[in-house]
A protein has these predicted regions:
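Conserved lysine of the Walker
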Residues: 39
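Short hydrophobic/aromatic beta-strand immediately N-terminal to the Walker A/P-loop
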Residues: 28-30
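Post-Walker A helix-loop "phosphate-sensing" segment adjacent to the P-loop in P-loop NTPases
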Residues: 48-58, 69-72
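Short phosphate-coordinating micro-motif centered on Lys-Gly-acidic
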Residues: 2, 93-158
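Conserved nucleotide-sensing/catalytic segment adjacent to the nucleotide-binding pocket
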Residues: 60, 66-108
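N-terminal pre-Walker A segment at the start of P-loop NTPase domains
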Residues: 1-18
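P-loop (Walker A) phosphate-binding loop of NTP-binding proteins
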Residues: 32-34
Length: 158
Protein backbone atom coordinates (compact mmCIF):
# COMPACT_ATOMS: atom_id res chain seq x y z
CA UNK A 1 0.00 0.00 0.00
CA UNK A 2 1.67 3.18 -1.20
CA UNK A 3 -1.65 4.99 -1.32
CA UNK A 4 -5.02 4.80 0.36
CA UNK A 5 -8.43 6.04 -0.75
CA UNK A 6 -10.27 7.97 1.95
CA UNK A 7 -14.01 8.58 1.53
CA UNK A 8 -14.99 10.45 4.70
CA UNK A 9 -13.71 12.52 7.61
CA UNK A 10 -14.23 9.43 9.77
CA UNK A 11 -11.88 7.41 7.57
CA UNK A 12 -9.32 10.23 7.68
CA UNK A 13 -9.49 10.15 11.47
CA UNK A 14 -9.17 6.35 11.38
CA UNK A 15 -5.92 6.79 9.46
CA UNK A 16 -4.84 9.31 12.08
CA UNK A 17 -5.64 6.83 14.85
CA UNK A 18 -3.57 4.16 13.11
CA UNK A 19 -0.67 6.60 12.89
CA UNK A 20 -0.98 7.56 16.55
CA UNK A 21 -1.36 3.99 17.82
CA UNK A 22 1.67 2.78 15.88
CA UNK A 23 3.84 5.76 16.83
CA UNK A 24 6.84 4.79 18.95
CA UNK A 25 8.03 8.27 19.93
CA UNK A 26 10.64 10.53 18.35
CA UNK A 27 8.51 10.39 15.19
CA UNK A 28 8.35 13.00 12.45
CA UNK A 29 5.25 13.09 10.22
CA UNK A 30 5.06 15.49 7.28
CA UNK A 31 1.63 16.35 5.87
CA UNK A 32 1.32 17.85 2.40
CA UNK A 33 -1.91 18.88 0.76
CA UNK A 34 -3.94 21.86 -0.35
CA UNK A 35 -6.02 23.97 2.03
CA UNK A 36 -8.92 21.87 3.28
CA UNK A 37 -7.30 18.59 2.26
CA UNK A 38 -7.78 17.03 5.71
CA UNK A 39 -4.42 17.54 7.43
CA UNK A 40 -5.92 18.80 10.69
CA UNK A 41 -8.69 16.17 10.54
CA UNK A 42 -5.98 13.51 10.31
CA UNK A 43 -4.17 15.09 13.27
CA UNK A 44 -7.38 14.93 15.33
CA UNK A 45 -7.34 11.15 14.85
CA UNK A 46 -3.70 11.02 15.94
CA UNK A 47 -4.58 12.97 19.09
CA UNK A 48 -7.41 10.57 19.92
CA UNK A 49 -5.06 7.60 19.62
CA UNK A 50 -2.62 9.35 21.95
CA UNK A 51 -5.50 9.91 24.42
CA UNK A 52 -5.30 13.68 24.17
CA UNK A 53 -8.57 15.12 25.46
CA UNK A 54 -8.22 18.76 24.40
CA UNK A 55 -9.73 19.76 21.06
CA UNK A 56 -7.16 19.80 18.26
CA UNK A 57 -7.15 23.03 16.29
CA UNK A 58 -5.22 24.09 13.24
CA UNK A 59 -1.92 25.75 14.16
CA UNK A 60 -2.09 28.11 11.16
CA UNK A 61 -1.84 31.31 13.21
CA UNK A 62 0.13 29.97 16.17
CA UNK A 63 2.67 27.98 14.10
CA UNK A 64 2.95 25.33 16.87
CA UNK A 65 0.31 23.76 19.11
CA UNK A 66 1.58 21.54 21.90
CA UNK A 67 -0.48 18.71 23.39
CA UNK A 68 1.50 17.18 26.26
CA UNK A 69 -1.22 15.50 28.32
CA UNK A 70 -1.62 12.23 26.38
CA UNK A 71 0.31 8.97 26.17
CA UNK A 72 3.10 10.94 24.51
CA UNK A 73 3.42 14.56 23.44
CA UNK A 74 1.99 15.70 20.12
CA UNK A 75 3.47 18.79 18.48
CA UNK A 76 1.28 20.01 15.64
CA UNK A 77 2.98 22.58 13.42
CA UNK A 78 1.95 24.60 10.41
CA UNK A 79 4.78 26.07 8.34
CA UNK A 80 2.53 27.87 5.85
CA UNK A 81 3.40 31.26 7.35
CA UNK A 82 7.11 30.45 7.20
CA UNK A 83 7.41 30.66 3.44
CA UNK A 84 10.82 32.27 3.92
CA UNK A 85 11.92 29.12 5.78
CA UNK A 86 13.03 31.02 8.90
CA UNK A 87 12.83 28.54 11.76
CA UNK A 88 14.56 30.79 14.30
CA UNK A 89 11.36 31.22 16.33
CA UNK A 90 10.89 27.45 16.69
CA UNK A 91 13.09 25.07 18.68
CA UNK A 92 12.79 22.31 16.09
CA UNK A 93 15.73 20.27 17.48
CA UNK A 94 14.09 20.42 20.91
CA UNK A 95 10.76 19.16 19.63
CA UNK A 96 12.42 16.38 17.64
CA UNK A 97 14.43 15.31 20.70
CA UNK A 98 11.30 14.77 22.81
CA UNK A 99 9.69 11.34 23.03
CA UNK A 100 6.69 12.51 21.07
CA UNK A 101 5.20 12.85 17.63
CA UNK A 102 5.94 15.96 15.56
CA UNK A 103 3.34 16.60 12.84
CA UNK A 104 4.26 19.29 10.32
CA UNK A 105 1.79 20.73 7.83
CA UNK A 106 3.25 22.52 4.79
CA UNK A 107 6.73 20.99 5.27
CA UNK A 108 7.94 22.11 1.84
CA UNK A 109 8.84 25.52 3.31
CA UNK A 110 11.39 24.03 5.73
CA UNK A 111 12.27 20.62 4.28
CA UNK A 112 15.99 21.48 3.99
CA UNK A 113 16.13 22.02 7.77
CA UNK A 114 14.53 18.71 8.72
CA UNK A 115 16.28 15.39 9.32
CA UNK A 116 16.23 12.93 6.45
CA UNK A 117 14.21 10.52 8.59
CA UNK A 118 10.43 10.95 8.35
CA UNK A 119 7.09 9.64 7.17
CA UNK A 120 5.34 11.85 4.64
CA UNK A 121 1.68 11.78 3.68
CA UNK A 122 0.50 13.66 0.63
CA UNK A 123 -3.25 14.22 0.69
CA UNK A 124 -4.97 14.94 -2.61
CA UNK A 125 -8.59 15.70 -3.39
CA UNK A 126 -10.23 13.26 -5.79
CA UNK A 127 -12.48 15.97 -7.21
CA UNK A 128 -12.79 19.76 -7.06
CA UNK A 129 -15.94 19.94 -4.93
CA UNK A 130 -15.36 21.56 -1.52
CA UNK A 131 -18.13 19.33 -0.13
CA UNK A 132 -16.38 16.14 -1.15
CA UNK A 133 -14.43 14.22 1.48
CA UNK A 134 -12.88 11.82 -1.03
CA UNK A 135 -9.09 11.87 -0.91
CA UNK A 136 -6.10 9.87 -2.02
CA UNK A 137 -3.34 9.68 0.58
CA UNK A 138 0.11 8.78 -0.74
CA UNK A 139 2.80 7.55 1.63
CA UNK A 140 6.55 8.05 1.55
CA UNK A 141 8.75 6.58 4.29
CA UNK A 142 12.32 7.86 4.55
CA UNK A 143 14.57 5.85 6.86
CA UNK A 144 14.28 2.28 8.10
CA UNK A 145 12.32 3.06 11.27
CA UNK A 146 9.74 4.95 9.21
CA UNK A 147 9.40 2.05 6.79
CA UNK A 148 8.60 -0.11 9.82
CA UNK A 149 6.20 2.55 11.10
CA UNK A 150 4.40 2.59 7.74
CA UNK A 151 4.10 -1.20 7.75
CA UNK A 152 2.45 -0.96 11.20
CA UNK A 153 0.01 1.66 9.92
CA UNK A 154 -0.88 -0.52 6.92
CA UNK A 155 -1.98 -3.35 9.23
CA UNK A 156 -4.99 -1.26 10.28
CA UNK A 157 -6.24 -1.30 6.68
CA UNK A 158 -5.68 -4.94 5.66
Amino acid sequence: MNSLEINSDEQMQKLGKAIGKSSKGHDLLLLSGDLGAGKTTLTKGIARALEIKRPVKSPTFTIVREYREGKRPLFHMDMYRLEDGDLSSIDMPGYLAEDGLVVIEWPQFIIEDLPNDYLELSIKRVDDSWDSTKRIVEFKAVGERNKLWLSEIKKYFE
